[in-house]
């Protein structure tokens, strides 16, 4: 992932502390069923003997894995991540499963840039993620960007505005019941649901069942009203969109959002088509706040 001119952002420090009200690491491991009281005594003794952190002592004794310690540290610092093998989300959510990877560090840099721009223009808190063609990575970027915003402590909403080929309900392992389609068709008020038990600050409004009239539904005033309500309730709202070459859906969504982030894939996205998309968005009054070039 190549993101230009995005300032750096440091990840959560990997250390242990009982200061500032953080919970005890041993208590977290006990509550997770990884240690019992006797094991804690053994770890504490090894910790004092070797002068090493509690987690390192527990791993050294073979009582827990490094992954167990990492998960406990994440809970200790209120930094939600998922353990490998968690069936509640798709592994493509690298921001949840691989928070220390280079790709996720790049996502944090992008998040920092968006936060800075929002500070200058507070209205830019509802952003459509758009692109020219299918397979460029819009859904992946929208989902993982939503995760890193929630990890920052922001109340985050991810809306699947791709009513033709919705992916968010698959990435977050949700059923198709309810969702945006049902709300736009005024058939149900069931909508936003928590993305995962570990991500209390992230809600997802999945698309729902694929309708025969996606563009007409998105053009209804109800959609703009849904986004207006989200602006009041959430710190950041990200909206996934269909590919622009399928129809006018993406531009309708972006116009309702007011801001758009344009996604391209290296060696696949044609520069001319990208320029045409950006120009058409600006003509529709959409603020193009940046571009992301994915290279994986």
Each model region followed by its residue ranges:
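P-loop/Walker-type NTP enzyme "switch/lid" segment
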Residues: 85-112, 119-120, 130-134, 154, ...
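Non-catalytic accessory regions
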Residues: 1-88
């Amino acid at each position: 992932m190549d993101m230009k001119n995005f300032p750096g952002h440091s990840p959560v420090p990997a250390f242990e502390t009982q200061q500032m009200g953080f919970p005890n690491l041993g208590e977290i491991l006990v509550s997770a069923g990884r240690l019992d009281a006797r094991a804690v005594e053994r770890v504490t003794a090894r910790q004092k003997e070797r002068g090493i952190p509690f987690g390192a002592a527990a791993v050294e004794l073979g009582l827990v894995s490094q992954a167990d310690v990492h998960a406990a540290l994440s809970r200790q610092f209120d930094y939600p991540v998922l353990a490998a093998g968690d069936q509640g989300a798709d592994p493509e959510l690298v921001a949840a499963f691989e928070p220390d990877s280079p790709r996720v560090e790049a996502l944090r840099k992008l998040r920092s840039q968006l936060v800075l721009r929002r500070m200058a223009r507070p209205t830019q808190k509802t952003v459509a993620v758009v692109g020219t063609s299918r397979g460029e990575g819009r859904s992946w970027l929208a989902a993982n960007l939503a995760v890193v915003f929630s990890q920052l402590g922001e109340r985050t909403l991810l809306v699947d505005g791709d009513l033709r080929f919705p992916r968010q309900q698959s990435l977050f392992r949700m059923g198709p019941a309810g969702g945006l389609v049902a709300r736009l068709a005024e058939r149900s008020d069931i909508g936003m649901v928590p993305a995962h038990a570990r991500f209390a600050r992230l809600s997802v409004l999945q698309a729902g069942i694929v309708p025969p009239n996606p563009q007409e539904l998105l053009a209804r005033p109800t959609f703009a009203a849904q986004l207006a309500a989200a602006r009041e309730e959430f710190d950041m709202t990200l909206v996934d969109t269909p590919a622009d070459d399928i129809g006018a859906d993406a531009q309708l969504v972006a116009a309702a959002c007011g801001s758009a982030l344009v996604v391209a894939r290296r060696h696949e996205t044609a520069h001319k088509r990208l320029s045409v998309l950006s120009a058409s968005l600006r003509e529709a009054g959409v603020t193009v706040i940046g571009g992301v070039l994915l290279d994986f």
